Amino acid sequence: MQMQVLTAASSLPRATLLRPAAAEPWRQSFLQLQARPIQRPGIMLHCKAQLQGQETRERRQLDDDEHARPPQGGDDDVAASTSELPYMIESIKSKLRAARNSLGETTVSAYDTAWIALVNRLDGGGERSPQFPEAIDWIARNQLPDGSWGDAGMFIVQDRLINTLGCVVALATWGVHEEQRARGLAYIQDNLWRLGEDDEEWMMVGFEITFPVLLEKAKNLGLDINYDDPALQDIYAKRQLKLAKIPREALHARPTTLLHSLEGMENLDWERLLQFKCPAGSLHSSPAASAYALSETGDKELLEYLETAINNFDGGAPCTYPVDNFDRLWSVDRLRRLGISRYFTSEIEEYLEYAYRHLSPDGMSYGGLCPVKDIDDTAMAFRLLRLHGYNVSSSVFNHFEKDGEYFCFAGQSSQSLTAMYNSYRASQIVFPGDDDGLEQLRAYCRAFLEERRATGNLRDKWVIANGLPSEVEYALDFPWKASLPRVETRVYLEQYGASEDAWIGKGLYRMTLVNNDLYLEAAKADFTNFQRLSRLEWLSLKRWYIRNNLQAHGVTEQSVLRAYFLAAANIFEPNRAAERLGWARTAILAEAIASHLRQYSANGAADGMTERLISGLASHDWDWRESNDSAARSLLYALDELIDLHAFGNASDSLREAWKQWLMSWTNESQGSTGGDTALLLVRTIEICSGRHGSAEQSLKNSEDYARLEQIASSMCSKLATKILAQNGGSMDNVEGIDQEVDVEMKELIQRVYGSSSNDVSSVTRQTFLDVVKSFCYVAHCSPETIDGHISKVLFEDVN
């Protein structure tokens, strides 16, 4: 019969398994999760990766793994892009290196440039002329065809009007470029009414404060604008309301985000405010506010700051500058999530070292050493630095909490979705020594994000990104401990907007080092290469499975595919095929042997069969033909072949010993509850296949650190395997409280992987433990349908 295909979107809630309990649920191993029957017991729903002809499309009667057909769908374009991957990588490297001394790769703000253009010459002796004529020139060169100024790629009426009004006022102030002034004024006249229909979710920062000030300047210049337009009355009212809420003494007492919009305020005590300048000389990294302050004070540091800005941006200035911390952190985050960070290890390390130097005990700002910190940059820095082994304290979040609630900036008027999203991601990288603050932060952020999802309000006030709702849903549906690298990357390839994403400041702006089309193109090419290799490895693995007749031992082709997927979703680099296939083959063969031993367990004879298998494994000259147990003989043959295939020299003995230890965990009493031992077998196999284990084997035997890693991994995976069996109809005994126990142990594992100062165990080996544990977490967390959907998407659905 024709099977229906189920795929699982990341936004789907986790489903409860409802199929009838198996007569012997313990026979269903960690890998042998089947989707629910949809017609009658016995008919299994396989993922479309198996049944939709993908394999046939790839095989083309291949006899050798060295031949492959490129993915279908624009094959020529895909082949061209993958062949150009090395050039794309080098181009990105050059861009990252060129930005190493940058204070932020961002686009110019016409609004801020207009405020700079308004500054009167400081040494003019009373004569009126612009201090920055190059700002006037920039304005003249960058008018859009429709007469406006602003972001050319996206229309938000507040962005277009505030940029256009600022530029028209600047040109009119100096009486230059009359034709362009007229076109800009006409644009304002034709579009002012749109303000009444604008979406307040995407308001420009400080718009209700700064736009009326520009209108007042325009009125004083005699510009023909309907200042009584109904759309403006609401803005005037909001300005008065907001100004009334600003405590004047607090504004002058300490640095706050209000400094960013000083150009919209009057009657300021400049002597007090100038003490809050950033190290670069600005007021809260705002060129517009700094230009206004310069006009009022003539401060030399403000002048130098603005000169630096317009020199770096060809006469213009961004809406925020510097943004060096934000730029570096977000670019690293994007490269990691796109799955291509391994190409830029030295550049990323340099960026993170820079961020570490700028992280203070009370958090981080988006630019330099700006005194006003925010939870968004702090969370991103905390997460990335911890994941790269830096010593950072969770106490940095204490400064953003008040009465059980968290804020991005003190005194904010509304909460930011992305700030809470990034804080939620950061709160999951927990060490045992952390106080309860991270747990409290996680609970608060999750509740906030869940509420926003429930109301369908997944837009942010600081960025316009079509993929953001999907990003948030994925984070809520798949916690970090159950999110596999290739799954996250495959999903993020569809979420990442590249150059289409726009950020919201006083106007729209782009972050070219963060949102870059070349990143996306390179990531797609890299993932396509991964899929090509994966499909070949899958065909080879399936032939191995058939050749060894493992289906006769209860291993389904679906289990084989899932075993390979779990390995490939964690270890995906092309040069790590031996580790990836070693993981997959070991998991498959362990399932086959487990199935064989369970048959003997039913008769109380598992111990005897285990001894025979151990004896046969230990003897290289074992005479297969003398065994009356053909099943045992075929399994030993497959095991011997696996060892010969993946281990050489002394490593062969190490791999045999690993299997011996795993077999010894089987007893009549264990009834197959060997999830922890299977996890250790996988870790040892991966390490042996990589060549790392052999060179360090003796030292690892004496390492307390390594021993503790084994203990934690074994304990966690044993509990998770119990949970998986229960979900598949097994005993519910000892299941209660497993999640909490696993979470406690996960904290220690994370610390030992990312926060250990010991050199006994390499960082790659530590990561192997985490990869294996996360694969167990993933299977315990996901429904079979979700897993099948991920298999299809990661391995078989071409990247568009």
Curated annotation (Swiss-Prot):
Gene3D superfamilies: 1.50.10.160, Farnesyl Diphosphate Synthase, Terpene synthase, N-terminal domain. Residues 55-69 have a biased composition (Basic and acidic residues). It is an enzyme of class 5 (isomerase). Induction: By UV irradiation. The keyword Cell wall biogenesis/degradation does not apply. GO terms for molecular function: ent-copalyl diphosphate synthase activity; magnesium ion binding; terpene synthase activity. Its EC number is 5.5.1.13. Transmembrane segments: none annotated. The keyword Transmembrane helix does not apply. Keywords: Isomerase, Magnesium, Metal-binding, Plant defense. Mg(2+) binds at residues 374, 376. It holds the Pfam family Terpene_synth. This is Ent-copalyl diphosphate synthase 2. The gene is CPS2.
